Design a protein with these regions (language model features):
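Domain-level signature for soluble enzymes in the chorismate/prephenate branch of the shikimate pathway
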Residues: 1-276
Length: 276
């Protein structure tokens, strides 16, 4: 049975490239304009699952994804995948590279390709776009001289790649998560990750230490922790945490039980296999 996926679009983004790694050939892949729209499509039942980026090894967390998971109608992560982020410089077929005066791309891509741009096109105007795929689409219409994005975008918009792997960090990787409506967690594999949004009742000295101690007490390792503003008032934060292990593992279950005693609220964001 085919699955209907939402993903951060438009077509030709790194998110689509990541989704193609895990989706079946008969699955339906539907592009949405932003992370919020993709996740709302799951909430509304328009799709069964969504794939969205959650962190990048160079740029850090994707704040919109973290905030959407921590608030609104609950959703859970059921899988994750990673994708090496390799940027390409592309132009129209008849464009001479020497004539490039404007380069369009997403701000994150620009920040990861600054050395290449400074060395090869120091006088080019860099134009920000909503996504790398949007830059490629605009280029196909003649809006810019060149675009920086994923190689998959060049195929979509019939563009010529004139330089590949132009990122300053050749080991850049983005982690993506599959998100669904709450249900039964995937079966424990022995190499899992449990994600949580943890809310403290009163922001006080040692609050984070109390949370960390619960995991340390039960020898549960944390692979990710990020504070995010609650939006209620200045200085109030909650924490997004990734713990190694499955919610059905005794150490993780014990740590969660301890957190419930000291935290105002805990939102379970899923237990799922770690990406290979």
């Amino acid at each position: 049975m085919s699955i209907k996926y939402a993903y951060l679009g438009p077509a030709g983004t790194f998110t689509e490239a990541a989704l193609l790694k895990i989706a079946a050939s008969d699955d339906q892949l539907i592009a949405y304009a932003n992370v919020t729209a993709a996740l709302d499509a799951v909430r509304k039942g328009e799709v069964s699952k969504a794939l969205v980026p959650i962190e990048n090894s160079v740029e850090g967390v994707v704040a919109r994804t973290l905030d959407e998971l921590a608030s609104g109608e609950p959703l859970v992560i059921t899988a994750e995948t990673t994708l090496p982020v390799t940027f390409s410089l592309m132009t129209l077929e008849n464009k001479d590279p020497k004539d490039i005066k404007s380069i369009a791309t997403h701000p994150h891509a620009e920040s990861q390709c600054r050395s290449f741009i400074a060395k090869n096109y120091p006088n080019a105007q860099v134009i920000e776009t909503a996504s790398t795929a949007a830059a490629a689409k605009g280029l196909s219409k003649g809006d810019y001289d060149a675009a920086i994005g994923a190689a998959i975008a060049a195929k979509y918009y019939q563009l010529k790649i004139i330089a590949g792997d132009i990122g300053d960090n050749t080991n850049a990787v983005t982690r993506f998560v599959v998100v669904e409506k709450p249900g039964k967690s995937p079966v424990a594999t022995g190499k899992d990750r449990t994600s949580l949004a943890v809310f403290i009742a009163i922001d006080h000295a040692g609050a984070l230490l109390e949370i960390l101690n619960e995991f340390a007490k039960h020898q549960v390792n944390l692979s990710f922790i990020q504070s995010r503003p609650t939006g209620s008032q200045l200085g109030h934060y909650h924490f997004i945490i990734d713990a190694e292990g499955h919610v059905e593992d005794k150490p993780v279950a014990a740590a969660l039980a301890g957190l419930k005693e000291i935290c105002e609220d805990i939102r379970f964001l899923g237990s799922y296999p770690q990406a290979k």
